[in-house]
Amino acid sequence: MIFHVCALPHTHSTAEYLACAYTAKVINFCRMMRSLGHQVFLYGGEKNEAPCTEHIVCVSEADRAAHVGDNHFTSASFDYNLPFWTNANAKMAAEISRRAEKQDFVCVIGGYAQKQIADALPHMITVEFGVGYGGTFSKFRVFESYAWMHVCYGAATMGKPHDADGNWWDVVIPGYLDPAQFPFSAEKDDYYMFIGRLVDRKGYRIAADVCFDLGKKLIVAGQGTPPLGAEYVGVVDPVTRGKLMSR
């Protein structure tokens, strides 16, 4: 099979940007599909570390950096009406058109922000291959979990839950990881760890409260404002993450 994978234009498909869950999804998807012998064409920024048949640059580093600005890249705007998004989407659609056959798959990871790509290629099958977000549009969707699939179903009914049928071909494929990034260590240290975006719904405050009550050390990694009393290590790279988790 042949997959045309559209990366997020405001990141690079490199280890430096793995704090973005959807960029990590793109890299792991490319690695997995190439390992199975499929062809993978990857469309994105100037830098790439994901295994692929061809890497097609559709966004200049100057444009990417200007869009992100002084923000952390995970806080970049997803306003698909901005020229940054319309230009990136148009370029990706044009490059896909030069390479694709009708039976190929177009794989998008940005939800509505990349719908313009699907609209420009109506003769092709566009798949949202990692739906863990709310702005979903495609007829063909792969959800991250059953819980999130049902959230999306319910949200789409506008308060009429009995209308939440979905499609019979909807599927859940849980997130996939590279085992090499999570080494085992028989030697352990005495601490707990939370890693993720530091927003309430991720539960980091619960981790902090539990560790406080137990009198235990808590190491916190991720974007945001850490809780008081925790050792904050910032946004960590895959090597540091692997070491912290292994201990």
Task: Give the role of each language-model region.
Residues 1-247:
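Catalytic cores of nucleotide-sugar-dependent glycosyltransferases that transfer UDP/GDP/TDP-activated
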